[in-house]
């Protein structure tokens, strides 16, 4: 695996790769890698001839009270994991490389509507940071495909929309959520949980499944079901940001005609804000 630290060197390498008519798959990450990230690389290997993974802790998507400085930087361990997964190129740019004019002076990409609700409501400006850095990475790499985990479903839809709206040629591919043995969605934030908190966090996925079962059984009072989900998590001791049932395409409140739904939640357990979702067809 080749590790590259600046944009010019990456683009020179990609010119050579494209001269050989090889397809490029991009896996953007912030590092501190876990099994979910590695699954993205594995899926990219299936569909792309050359896989480029990026590690960039993006300051633009950290809000007030979210500690950018203390986000885990584990480059050595991450490189070993990517090499084991047969990643071809690792791109590790600095903040200066990505935001040469500084965070406040550069262009910001904003995806309206989708960015304002759910996690966007609780983390204002977060998705502008995501959209901006993803646009930069797609422009730098000119990847044929880019791979995103469906655990961050709102982010996945936002990226898919910005690619469509900006006429970018990259195909955005969502990859199924990887889970711990207890059902907890894999996340870098799980590292902050104690053994007891990890066990307690099982309630997130079990509550999503509970509400999904009620919908599949024919219940259609979505407001009431959201309240049940919220209360179930709250009763377990979780600090719940939201529990929502939406259509899977635009994250709007579903009508009775909608058949493809998603149940989404964000809840704080111990020090970690955890998100998860469950897609279902009725």
Predicted regions and their residues:
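Phosphate/ribose-recognition catalytic cores of enzymes acting on nucleotide-derived substrates
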Residues: 228-282
């Amino acid at each position: 695996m080749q590790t590259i630290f600046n944009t010019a060197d990456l683009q020179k390498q990609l010119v050579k790769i494209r001269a050989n008519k090889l397809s490029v798959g991009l896996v953007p990450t912030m590092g501190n890698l876990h099994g979910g990230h590695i699954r993205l690389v594995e899926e990219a290997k299936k569909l792309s001839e050359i896989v480029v993974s990026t590690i960039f802790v993006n300051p633009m998507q950290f809000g007030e009270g979210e500690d950018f400085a203390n986000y885990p930087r584990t480059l050595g361990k991450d490189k070993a994991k990517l090499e084991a997964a047969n990643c071809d190129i690792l791109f590790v740019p600095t903040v200066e490389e990505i935001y040469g004019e500084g965070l406040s002076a550069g262009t910001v990409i904003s995806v309206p509507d989708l960015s304002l609700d759910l996690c966007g409501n609780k983390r204002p400006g977060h998705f502008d940071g995501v959209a901006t850095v993803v646009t930069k990475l797609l422009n730098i790499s000119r990847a044929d495909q880019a791979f995103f985990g469906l655990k961050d479903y709102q982010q996945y839809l936002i990226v898919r929309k910005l690619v469509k709206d900006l006429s970018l040629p990259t195909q955005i591919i969502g990859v199924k959520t990887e889970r711990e043995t207890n059902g907890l969605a894999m996340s870098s934030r799980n590292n902050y949980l104690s053994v007891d908190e990890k066990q307690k966090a099982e309630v997130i996925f079990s509550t999503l499944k509970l509400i999904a079962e009620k919908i599949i059984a024919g219940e259609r009072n979505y407001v009431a079901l959201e309240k049940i989900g919220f209360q179930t998590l709250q009763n377990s001791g979780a600090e719940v940001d939201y529990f929502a049932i939406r259509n899977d395409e635009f994250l709007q409140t579903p009508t009775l005609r909608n058949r493809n739904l998603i149940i989404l939640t964000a809840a704080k357990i111990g020090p970690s804000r955890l998100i998860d979702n469950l897609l279902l067809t009725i």
